[in-house]
Regions:
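Terminus-proximal functional modules
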Residues: 1-83
Length: 83
């Protein structure tokens, strides 16, 4: 398996898990891009637990065309569905 295929699989796993959590009632609390990767924090409204997902920034950007959001406004983040 070449490197490109590995990266595509990593991106798919990251997005699949994030979307599954959103579908299960988790809400996007904060998502930001760092120098070494992407952190996606999902906040569960029922019990307050946070789940953190991450993927390398360059891999995720190749897939999403740089639609990585950075916001502290939870209401605004909840409305964003540009995955």
């Amino acid at each position: 398996m070449n490197k490109a295929k590995v990266n595509e699989r990593m991106i798919f796993d990251y997005e699949e898990r994030r979307n599954a959590l959103l579908a299960d009632g988790y809400r996007l609390r904060h998502e930001t891009i760092l120098s070494d990767g992407v952190i996606c924090r999902l906040h569960h409204m029922a019990n307050g637990n946070d789940i953190i997902l991450s993927a390398k920034a360059n891999q995720l950007q190749q897939k999403t065309n740089n639609v990585v959001v950075h916001t502290q406004n939870y209401d605004e983040a909840d409305k964003m569905r540009q995955y």
